[in-house]
Amino acid sequence: MKNKSLVLKILENDKGGKIVLSTLAVVVFVVSFCNLFVPVDSVFHISTFTVTILGKYLAFALLALALDLVWGYLGVLSLGHGAFFALGGYGLAMYLMRQIGDRGVYGNPDLPDFMVFMNLKELPWFWYGFDNPLFAFFMIMAIPAILAFIFGWFAFKSRVTGVYLSIITQALTYALMLAFFRNDMGFGGNNGLTDFKDILGFDLQADTTRVGLLIVTFLFLTLGYLICR
């Protein structure tokens, strides 16, 4: 077979990868089908809660894949990967909060509910632009990448390695956690960002949206795995 697809070429000598990705593809298909097309009163129906949990597992698998790339292939034990993962998550959450508009508890079209509760009069400057999905999705990738570059530059330039680098990465995560937990930081404090309504115009409570997000997460996980290979 001379005209093999790029995916098949990458996985040609990766039997384990083919088995895992194929199994996940079957699981995602079966779960999606049983959620959308099997009657709710059927024993074969899979709940939307299960769909959501599976989507979270796949998202965490993507995080584990990133950690494996840094630790398993480069030999750098990072205990702070959760920090970069969280920054991307907060970026998406900020976009989702901006989509709520006047549908919040306080009905303020410009400020999220927690900002109204905190008696803020205007939107913090770092929230601007997150009502635009293209800007938001760009920042979701750019902000963690910039932080990782700056942190890595100073760490490796200072020749910090081994367990000392691991401790520093853990300290970075803890410092960011303390910062985000502060109510005056503008990120919802220890309650976080909640009460999302929709994403790109699709109702987040709809079964079809949850299944769509599950499939997209699986595709990104597959893409991430292929890039790592």
Question: Where are the regions that the model predicts?
Answer:
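Transmembrane alpha-helices and adjacent helix-loop boundaries
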Residues: M1-R229
